[in-house]
Amino acid sequence: AKNCCDAIPLLSLSDQPRTHVRELMVDPCRTFIPYEQLKAFIPEMARYKLNAIHLHLVDDQAWRIEIKKYPRLTAEASSRWGMDDMNMPIKGYYTQEQMRDLVSYAAKYHVQVVPEIEMPGHEVAAISVYPELTCHGVQVPIRTTCGVSDELLCPGNEFIYEFLGNVFKELADVFPSPYIHLGGDEAGNPALDCWTNCPKCQALKKKLGITTTDRSENWKLQGYLFDRMIELLRNRYHKTPMFWYELDFKKIQPGCVTFAWRSGLTEEALKAAVENNARIMLCPGEHCYFDYPMAKGDMPEVNWGMPVTTLKDTYRLDPGWGMGEDFENNNLFGVAGTLWSECINTPERIYYQAYPRALALAEAGWSMQKNRSWEGFILRMEPTLEDMMRRGITFSMEY
């Protein structure tokens, strides 16, 4: 130090995170994120001690990860027509070599890369080239709009287990993360009607001892599908499965990680996690859906009527949810912000939607509740945003 004003006092710091994982999920399916732009997202995350990036690689609109056993997935199902006003490509996929490079690069920043393969719903891209994955075996086109498709994988069809087994074999070799996300969301009624009318699914119900043909019992078929995938991931690849929590799917295997995402239903998800000795990732929409606008009318050209999640809404997230010390020690896994890409159409928009809400999420996941205050956060955030501006990082000023 040149003088006393430049000196740093001798001190000792003791610090540790409140939650094990502080994650951002990105969705290159609806709008493809070119590899170099995806890679550039990681250093900014690491600045704020966000330590996991969750890649939503499969959905109705595209299949984005190379699977060498099934080359048609990327040759044919990585292109989507429609939504022509998007400024980013709607064609593209990531090679396994790129993903290995991403894993290595992220590790330098202490960020792990977690892949997600959706099932049994949100699989139209795969079904478009392999219709034998369904109950009906009829080819359907890739979905070109938002929303939820009624198309599902057929749990009574042994081919889907062969298919998924081969997919996970390659993923396990590419991604060293101990976690793989299996999706599981929005495979509800009336989509489950296809299982009711499927001879293979009805034969499986009989084999499982399910005597009723009631549609509500079809959830047990999803449970069977997940049980087989959990066994595969745990026993063969030593991976911990993750899921999007759904109230109708009440069976959660101990040790799995379930994501509480539906707005207003977090308490039910927490209760299910505790009862099943599972762990939970908090990403409730009212706090953590970063694809939602931060202010009413923000970017109306791409906002299809989503609710508003303000910066303060994100900061209000209490990862402990008032559940007590036992819950935090035994069940709380982490917090996650989600960047679904129906309305994210440029690289700048990714940052705009993520920041500064990701700063609030990072603090919620790191600091104990007693050490947090909205006023203090704002004071610390403003010079951080000035630094981001100097470095050319886009962020929202709607706070």
Task: Set out the residue ranges of the language-model regions.
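Soluble non-cytosolic domains of exported or imported proteins
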Residues: 32-36, 93, 97, 158, ...
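Flexible, acidic glycine-rich loops studded with aromatic residues
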Residues: 241-247, 251-399
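Active-site neighborhood of glycoside hydrolase catalytic domains
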Residues: 126-132, 136, 141-257, 262-277
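Flexible loop/turn segments at secondary-structure boundaries
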Residues: 32-34, 60-66, 120-126, 181, ...
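Acidic-residue sensor for enzyme active/binding pockets
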Residues: 116-118, 186, 363
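Feature activates predominantly on carbohydrate-active enzymes
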Residues: 1-179, 195, 228, 232, ...
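Short glycine/serine/threonine/alanine-rich loop segments
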Residues: 50, 111, 238-239, 278
